[in-house]
Amino acid sequence: MAKCFITGKKKSFGNSRSHAMNASRRTWKANLQKVRILVDGKPKRVWVSARALKSGKVKRV
């Protein structure tokens, strides 16, 4: 799984609980989008989290 270029977000781990409270491991995937942004003055296609895009931490090219 990819990682956010800006915030470093990646998938997180936890338990899925049944009605009987039995635990089985599961993952939550980060909402990552592949976008073109300027990196060192050049356009580059990277994975960026939706939160970073919405908050304006990056500017699309």
UniProtKB/Swiss-Prot annotation:
One of its GO terms (cellular component) is ribonucleoprotein complex. GO terms for molecular function: structural constituent of ribosome. GO terms for biological process: translation. It comes from the Bacteria. Signal peptide: none annotated. It holds the Pfam family Ribosomal_L28. The keyword Cytoplasm does not apply. This is Large ribosomal subunit protein bL28. The gene is rpmB.
